């Protein structure tokens, strides 16, 4: 086994130059009585995920929920007010009726328990229609991101946050902050690392992309999103277990790291692809895979819109290299995984299963074909769906 030298490991600089850390240090003197009498705000699933991403530095250079100038700049220019690339406004919405209650230090709660604080510096009106048109490219409430946008409050609170403790959730063994992922990359001596994200169960086309890129870089960060997703998406626990069995049998362990990505899905397609790439830079990653319809839903985005949007920035601004792949699939005639660039055969030779088709087969108790996914992964999915009956 080749051992990489750690002598010259230089990880990518976090966006903005410094990895934000707004997590209260362990052992810090803290008197819960300090929170008594302060206004309390119960966080939604998405806002709680945003709090963690902000506080741990995954959303560096942001130190809290966006103020109005940054909010409008991100919507209209895909940049913060100072020009830093940023594609999706990270906001904390409340109802207009409640907004006046929140001033100064606000206690953020989850299930009634205090999990952090927000120092309110601004309250401003959300431009929901503008945000829907520019960020999601539609005002159609059948789009899950747009539906969530219109369902939330119409006033945004802004200011720096503090997180009391990193929530390790259901995957403590795989839950690492950006600084912790950076430490693993440094310890392993990876000069170049590629990150891959999906909210879907892993299949052979994903594996193909992973192994092609492992020919080019030192390490692979498998970074499945485990925050809030649509109700019909495969549950995070099932997806993580599928990754575990795949890594056990088919991946080089010394060159692969499985770590969960606790963000919530917004289904913003191209805009969300940028957010996913920039945040991976903060995790210390040098390359990020963007495939077909990354972070998309339905027919709202073109197949490769999420790849083309990166031309809005220079490579130096991005600070992470985007690896763009076409749709890959199994060709029965070629007898292997291919793409339109490498296969001369028509679609009748190809095995392509959509996410909807996969879910239909699983609900019907059918086993997924070996050409589509590894047998071990197929069994994990079959058991998970059988348990739902």
Swiss-Prot record:
The keyword ATP-binding applies. The keyword Nucleus does not apply. It catalyses: sulfate + ATP + H(+) = adenosine 5'-phosphosulfate + diphosphate. Its EC number is 2.7.7.4. It is an enzyme of class 2 (transferase). Pathway: Sulfur metabolism; hydrogen sulfide biosynthesis; sulfite from sulfate: step 1/3. Keywords: ATP-binding, Nucleotide-binding, Nucleotidyltransferase, Transferase. CDD domains: ATPS. InterPro entries: ATP-Sase_PUA-like_dom (IPR025980), PUA-like_sf (IPR015947), Rossmann-like_a/b/a_fold (IPR014729), SO4_adenylyltransferase_pro (IPR020792), Sulfurylase_cat_dom (IPR024951), Sulphate_adenylyltransferase (IPR002650). PANTHER family: PTHR43509, SULFATE ADENYLYLTRANSFERASE (PTHR43509:SF1). This is Sulfate adenylyltransferase. It comes from Deinococcus geothermalis (strain DSM 11300 / CIP 105573 / AG-3a). The lineage of its organism: Bacteria, Thermotogati, Deinococcota, Deinococci, Deinococcales.
